[in-house]
């Protein structure tokens, strides 16, 4: 339905590359986008990613992901774990943290300046927040038992996470400004995998309080909890769509 074409030339006096590109709608028979980018050789890939973002948004209406970063965990050899980031195409790989003990559950802050993750470096699961510019790491306090699944609120002011500090895995909320921790769920079942709604007023989480893993929603205003899924014996890892109207999750219908 669309054709993307581009032409590249070199400015001899500046050694800059000039890229002219356009997006053509075949069905409508018209140009949708014309663009020009001027770039050095070192930043040519970044410029192409920015062009891809413009083209993607023109076609879909959504923001492109081509200038974003990937964050992932590697276990290249025994007793070696790495938390890395790289460009969307795999280039410019950087190791943010490495440890002889497992690393789990990395998550970006909304502004992309910090990350959270779980590390077992001190013999127990412990949640850390790391500043990407300075590399400074702070622990979310050390408690025995389970400390896992940290996720950032949309405004970057809170972390939801799971802890068994009271004897059973429940969902907690950490205020990054006051450093106050609030307990959100209190049940003898296992509550885990919290996820914020787009407006930050609700949390989706997985619980086996009904006997099998199912998705539940809790209001952070009223603390009212509602069961979301009923079909199947395994529904987990729920995440809200950005529009707040739908969720995506893992479902198993095998009995």
Task: Explain the meaning of each model-derived region.
Residues 1-52:
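Amphipathic beta-strand/beta-sheet edge segments enriched in Tyr/Trp
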Residues 87-102, 130-148, 174-190, 218-234:
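Multi-bladed beta-propeller domains
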Residues 254-255:
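Conserved small/polar residues in nucleotide/adenosyl-binding loops
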